[in-house]
């Protein structure tokens, strides 16, 4: 299995393996379970098992914050781009001369500091641009043997990328190539980055017909190029601003239970608005349903709505998605929560099990800007609103 398999994929594969083990077990009987390879190898009557750790996002966020503070001992915040809870990009170009270290030595020093401070090992990709850094980490470093301290570091430049990874498969291992892109490329006989690069020389127009303006970035990446830099990312100002919150529920939820989670998410979203001194005039909600709605025969027979296929090829009820405009700009927890619940009640099928919730506060602007829109938002009403919000929290 791949190193980033989904839980349902692991369960499915383990079920298949245990069917095979049962067929070859004495008397076709499995007497117990184990998740230790040595025990499973020696005892054919044991079924494969594995522990499932419940997610602890608050703990993960705390660890991520601690690790980021370690990064700042070596690199200034303006040279760090936080990509996810466990990944960052760093531009260390100007730090190497003063440190007297190579890029690999510099990265290793940071990684060892993280391990000494938190006990967490890290992997690094070094490259001549952002794309090569990401690919060096995702594809090359993660498959290298760790040193005595658990450190894995890989380097790529444009030429070594072409030498090592032009023939690599699957394409979905590469940053920014999803299953949809890979499927469309395969339909046109392109299965590797090398294929894409060669196609860009011989038949570039085909790539633009398939992907529009996004073909430009795809072609750049196929050759190991990346035009975007860390300073450009830090300077970027999006035309449309929003903040969001999403949850994948750890098990299928009935409507009432999912609504309670949504209320908590809406309340937290409003608190984020207040803390950041911004306001919104639109709430967007997306509700994703669980596969059990169609895999359970009794539920399947009762459902007559639209069906879509997820990225793993599974059939699920079509997700619910909608927008609720607010009367004016606000950061009121009460108003945002009510809007989210009204939207939820209007959109969802109450007979279906829910697995994902995603809420967005759209069109966000600073409080001061909202105050200037006197035709929509008066200073008096806003002062009253902020006082009410403060009392709620």
What are these regions (language model features)?
Residues 1-220, 227-230, 377-386, 391:
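Gly/Gly-Pro- and Ser/Thr-rich, intrinsically disordered tail segments characteristic of DNA damage-repair
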Residues 87, 121, 282-284, 356:
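Broad gene-expression machinery/nucleic-acid interaction feature
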Residues 93-95, 128-133, 287-294, 362-368:
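Short, internal active-site loops enriched in acidic
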Residues 173, 181-354, 366-378:
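DNA-contacting surface of Y-family translesion DNA polymerases
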